[in-house]
Structure formats: C-alpha cells, structure tokens
Amino acid sequence: MPLSRNSSLKRSPMKTQRAKPSDEEKQARALVRVRSGGWCEMRLTGCLGEATDFSHRVGRGQGGPWSASNGLAACRRCHSWCHSRRTEAEDLGLILRSGQDPTVEPVAYQNAGFVVLDNLGYLWPVLDEEIA
C-alpha cells in the first residue's frame, strides 16, 4: 500500500543499547569520583572544571581495566583534548599504551606535578628524579 501525503508515519522510541555497568565499572567510577571530588583531574588549558567523563588511561579497546588507577575524572574538553592530541597526552601520562601498567606509570595531576594512582582511589606524589 503506497503512502499518501496525508498519512502520518508511526515512530517508535529508540532503544538504548548500552549494557548495565559491571561491578568493576561501578566501583572504579565511585573511587575516581571520591578522589576527584567531582572536579576534573586533568586541569588542562581551557578546562571546564566539573568532571563529567571517566577517561581511561589504557583504553578499553586495548585491554584497559575498569580500575581507579586506569581512570581519571575529566571534563568533556580535557577528555577530548587527550584524544585529539594523543602524543602530548601520552607525555603527561593521561593516556597510556596497551601493556603499560597504570599503577606504575605517573600522570600529571591537576597541574600539581606527577602522581601515581592506585586501585584504592589514592594518589602518591612522584619525586622529579623518579620521572624518566
């Protein structure tokens, strides 16, 4: 049956395809949220301040785990910057390569120097001579 100009199309609502978060994801997100206090942990130039994203240091597609050491709370602008300027983000430890250990690799933290993140949601300052 052909459509006429006066007939209306029925639209159905789009269904979300996102799976329910795992326990590991929930725990990692909660620990990072507490550590950051809801603020962007990257604090790059142009930072929006409030954290809205969970930024993986080792990407999920590269085998990166859901863990507090592998995640940073980020505003959308800082998170986008990391993906558009990958080499610079790697130099700052904001993005790691597959196989790198996020519990060992230092990360530039809120313009306050380099720290090492652990899986309990803590951060540990790194002395300048420890950064190679």
Language model features: what each stretch is:
Residues 55-56, 79:
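Histidine-centered divalent metal-coordination motifs
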Residues 45-49, 71-92:
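Short Cys/His-centered divalent metal-binding micro-motifs
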Residues 37-38, 70-72:
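Short, surface-exposed beta-edge/turn micro-motifs
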Residues 58-71:
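Short linker/helix segments within small regulatory modules
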Residues 67, 77-80, 98-101:
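Glycine-rich loops and low-complexity Gly/Arg-rich segments
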Residues 1-39, 43-51, 90, 96-132:
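A boundary/linker detector
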Residues 19, 23, 66, 73:
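A short glycine-/small-residue-rich loop at the edge of a beta-strand within enzyme catalytic domains
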